[in-house]
Design a protein with these regions (language model features):
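Core segments of cupin and vicinal oxygen chelate
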Residues: 1-50, 54, 73-100
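Short hydrophobic-acidic sequence motifs that mark active-site Asp/Glu residues
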Residues: 42, 65, 103
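A generic structural micro-feature
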Residues: 56-58
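Short hydrophobic/aromatic beta-strand micro-patches
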Residues: 15, 65-69
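Short, Lys/Arg-rich amphipathic alpha-helical interaction segments
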Residues: 99-118
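A short local loop/turn or secondary-structure capping micro-motif enriched for an aromatic residue
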Residues: 52-54, 65, 112-116
């Protein structure tokens, strides 16, 4: 089995221009994010800085995120929007791909049993 077959829903990412309580800055993509663990429906809000290198669907469209065992295996064969990178000082590795016209984030947590947020 590959990383996709072991995927588990993690959150939905929604683009916003409004500041939200508890935002954390992700330097690699220059975006402020909220913890979906603090939202009753696991929504993560993303607020991009004007100088963010992120463009296109990843910056403009919502995404659905899944936990996978192997992010490299999960992205194989997909149109990669943003290749794997670390967030939270090694808390997890993430990558973004297009799947049938929608943005999908694959997340490989350093600790697969992790329930928190970086």
């Amino acid at each position: 089995m590959d990383g996709i077959e072991r995927a588990q829903f993690d959150h939905i990412g929604v683009i916003t221009e409004e500041q939200h309580d508890g935002e954390v800055f992700v330097d690699a993509t220059r975006v402020w994010v909220t913890s979906p663990r603090d939202h009753p429906f696991h929504v993560e809000y993303l607020r991009f800085e004007p100088d963010s290198p992120v463009t296109g669907p990843l910056r403009n469209d919502p995404h659905v995120a899944y936990r996978v065992r192997d992010v490299d295996a999960a992205i194989a064969g997909h149109d990669v929007l943003l290749p794997p990178f670390e967030v939270g000082g090694g808390f997890c590795r993430v990558a973004f791909v297009m799947v049938r016209g929608g943005v999908v984030e694959f997340m490989q947590y350093a600790n697969p049993d992790e329930d928190g947020w970086f």
